[in-house]
Amino acid sequence: MRALWIVAVLLVGVEGSLVEFETLIMKIAGRSGISYYSSYGCYCGAGGQGWPQDASDRCCFEHDCCYAKLTGCDPTTDVYTYRQEDGEIVCGGDDPCGTQICECDKAAAICFRDSMNTYDYKYLRFSPENCQGESQPC
């Protein structure tokens, strides 16, 4: 029961549709975004400051930058749809904002998959104290 409560807390107040993003990460990278990336490095999870610690953390940095470039969209509330065609994720639907958010999430999931060999457990639950200083620009 306690584990369900923790998951419920994680699902509240996180940028984007965490359920959709988690599903994309599972489909593309084959691993749980919540388990591996909800608190990793300087950029995976809430906020972000300093420099990305490795390629996996850079995926989260790029994801934050992708969201920052969206105009007139709110990744915290807008939802999206996608489909699979020949094993590929295709973002779509009638909502242009949803499609853009989906593309950001898809790019991050692909990045996680492609940088899996650089994942380093020393950055899991990385202290924000190690992420001080000026942030890298997008």
Swiss-Prot record:
Its main location: secreted. GO terms for cellular component: extracellular region. Binds 1 Ca(2+) ion. Disulfide bonds join C42-C131, C44-C60, C59-C111, C65-C138, C66-C104, C73-C97, C91-C102. GO terms for molecular function: calcium ion binding; calcium-dependent phospholipase A2 activity; phospholipid binding; toxin activity. Pfam families: Phospholip_A2_1. Heterodimer of an acidic and a basic chain. The acidic subunit is non-toxic, without enzymatic activity and comprises 3 peptides that are cross-linked by 5 disulfide bridges. The basic subunit is toxic, has phospholipase A2 activity and is composed of a single chain. This is Phospholipase A2 homolog mojave toxin acidic chain.
